[in-house]
């Protein structure tokens, strides 16, 4: 059986082979941590964005969307705190010359303790069977107790160092835990230092008159500076939200794990404006709703979990992540934050504008508090691909690679195939494709054997293959083959639209969010 690392490498290769993701500028040997989405990748990505956008703006009558500019007045980023506080703690290994985020090295060490604990629990569960009491085992097994104690002690030191921004303590933790460089295997570390993540450029025609501006590191600020515009023109009443999908840019020194951490990425963010004092109620609401949204895709409830922050951002009074089980461990795909009134108050201070809301029920004005949901499109894309990628051994020893993608997200919903390239079958298949293509992304394939064509569609996650044979010309029926089960059934051509609609329409998925 392949290790998780080997499976992940196969997935990355699969993404390139089947037109999901390509290295950017590959003819020039590529550009580090920059990727292009291919013909199937862009369809999957667009479907993810539509699933999010509709869940926000269609299911919630008090949420509207905007599309703010990437370039913003530079004072925006001074007000938001990004100029002074948007940093990562970095450390170098003197032997390998490689640079790492100090906090990530320590988080990986915490994960190793968790893995040791889970390994002991798994062995005991297998040994004792149904009579196994996991909690009692954790409380009494000496090896588990020792690892729990080490983990808790490390977690406490780590949280304290982060909250105090104590770079010396972060390095000391790395030394005390004997964390080695993955490349050199040595513990020859430099001091930890802060590095600002924003890309800057200049706007203007001359060097003397140019203004220093930034590529936005997040989409949220475009929402905050448009709060008054949207609230007034939309006659919005508290509570209400503003949603946005757009590109953001961060000069990540340690960009890694394929599209998980990139320098150019896409965000789906929603800022929800509420009365001060009600923010925790809405924080819990969005925390629950967003997890439901992920689980509704059917990628396995056990693959999701919450992770509360050890250190809160400068703007937050509560924060949690929704993590997905990637081949390289549980990793964040979405963050839910209670941002208080920090952003609106800062922009009011720096702009000199009054940014408030008059509440007719309370008969007073106030600066709203904000609950944020922020999800990375690229991380969501990767989580879906990781959850869907399967290598199966079939009866008779044959194998197949299949993407068990949720039908609502699949790049192609159906592929229409004539059994042979003659006898009027291609013409009939084209007729069926023309009938479906206005409502569903549909492919046509007549090359190679029917078995090879099935495998090609399995590899890109197409839920249905529709085969036109000689009987079709007489009975107006086709064979529809289901991707996950490979089961085949004979159905009337007139029923195809209904079958695909039921499986691929987001309405059925949205019902799970109630």
Features from the language model and the residues they span:
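NTP/phosphate- and nucleic-acid-binding module
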Residues: 1-514
């Amino acid at each position: 059986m392949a290790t998780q690392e080997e499976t992940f490498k196969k997935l990355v290769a699969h993404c390139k082979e089947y037109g999901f993701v390509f290295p950017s500028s590959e003819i020039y040997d590529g550009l580090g941590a920059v990727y292009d989405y291919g013909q199937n990748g862009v369809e999957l990505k667009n479907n993810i964005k539509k699933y999010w956008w509709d869940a926000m703006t269609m299911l919630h009558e008090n949420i509207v969307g905007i599309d703010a500019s990437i370039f913003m007045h530079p004072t925006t980023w001074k007000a938001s705190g990004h100029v002074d506080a948007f940093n990562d703690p970095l450390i170098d290994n003197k032997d390998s010359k490689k640079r790492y985020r100090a906090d990530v090295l320590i988080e990986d060490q915490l994960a190793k303790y968790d893995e040791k604990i889970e390994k002991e629990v798994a062995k005991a569960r297998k040994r004792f069977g149904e009579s196994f009491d996991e909690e009692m085992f954790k409380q009494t097994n000496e090896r588990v107790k020792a690892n729990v104690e080490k983990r808790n002690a490390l977690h406490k030191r780590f949280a304290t160092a982060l909250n105090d921004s104590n770079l010396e303590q972060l390095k000391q933790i790395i030394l005390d835990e004997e964390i080695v460089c993955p490349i050199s295997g040595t513990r020859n570390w430099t001091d930890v230092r802060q590095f600002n993540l924003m890309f800057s450029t200049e706007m203007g025609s001359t060097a003397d008159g140019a203004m220093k501006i930034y590529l936005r590191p997040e989409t949220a600020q475009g929402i905050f500076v448009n709060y008054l515009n949207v609230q007034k023109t939309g006659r919005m009443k508290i509570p209400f939200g503003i949603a946005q999908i757009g590109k953001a840019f961060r000069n990540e020194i340690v960009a890694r794990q394929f599209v998980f951490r990139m320098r150019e990425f896409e965000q789906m963010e929603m800022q929800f404006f509420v009365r001060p004092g009600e923010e925790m109620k809405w924080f819990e609401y969005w925390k629950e709703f967003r997890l439901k949204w992920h689980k509704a895709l059917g990628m396995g409830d056990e693959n999701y979990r919450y992770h509360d922050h050890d250190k809160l951002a400068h703007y937050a009074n509560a924060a949690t992540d929704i993590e997905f089980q990637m081949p390289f461990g549980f990793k964040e795909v979405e963050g839910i934050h209670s941002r208080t009134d920090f952003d609106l108050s800062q922009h009011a201070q720096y702009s000199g504008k009054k940014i408030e809301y008059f509440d007719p029920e309370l008969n007073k004005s106030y600066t709203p508090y904000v609950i944020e949901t922020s999800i990375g499109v690229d991380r969501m894309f990767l989580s879906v691909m990781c959850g869907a990628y399967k290598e199966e051994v079939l009866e008779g020893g044959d194998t197949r690679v299949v993407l068990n993608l949720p039908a609502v997200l699949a790049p192609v919903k159906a592929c229409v195939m004539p059994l042979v390239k003659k006898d009027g079958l291609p013409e009939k298949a084209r007729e069926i494709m023309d009938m479906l293509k206005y409502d569903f992304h549909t492919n046509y394939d007549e090359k190679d054997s029917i078995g090879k064509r099935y495998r090609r569609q399995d590899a890109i996650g197409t839920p249905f293959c529709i085969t036109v044979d000689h009987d079709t010309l007489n009975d107006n029926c086709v064979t529809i083959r289901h991707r996950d089960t490979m089961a085949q059934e004979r159905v009337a051509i007139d029923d195809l639209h209904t079958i695909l609609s039921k499986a691929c329409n987001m309405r059925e998925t949205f019902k799970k969010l109630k």
